[in-house]
């Protein structure tokens, strides 16, 4: 089941979609401008409004830091353990103190209540 989203961070990183299955939660993102992108696995926070944290499993379409991929309008994915179907919102936050942090993403209070799950 997936829900379309349109959350943006600094007008550059766009959170397009969340998909939840029995085994994982998959977030689809892209950048609107040419950026050298990598995923800060260390200290990545994905949690729902109740404060439940869901551990990071893997990234797809982009490497873990420090290896950066130059991309624009190319989807990439962050995969976490399966979140509760009862969740009403979530935060996705990269650790600003992580070793390779440049402009760590912060998506807070992304609302799932308007979702039309398909």
Language-model segments: residues:
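Catalytic phosphate/metal-binding cores of nucleic-acid and nucleotide-processing enzymes, i.e., regions
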Residues: 19
């Amino acid at each position: 089941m997936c829900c379309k989203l349109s959350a943006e961070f600094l007008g550059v990183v766009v959170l397009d979609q969340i998909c939840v299955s029995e085994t994982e939660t998959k977030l689809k993102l892209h950048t609107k401008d040419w950026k050298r992108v990598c995923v800060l696995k260390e200290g990545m926070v994905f949690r729902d409004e109740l404060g439940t944290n869901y551990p990071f499993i893997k990234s797809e379409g982009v490497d873990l830091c420090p290896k950066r991929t130059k991309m624009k309008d190319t989807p990439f994915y962050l995969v976490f353990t399966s979140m509760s179907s009862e969740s009403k919102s979530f935060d996705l936050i990269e650790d600003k103190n992580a070793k390779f942090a440049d402009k760590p993403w912060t998506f807070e209070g992304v609302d799932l209540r308007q979702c039309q799950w398909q």
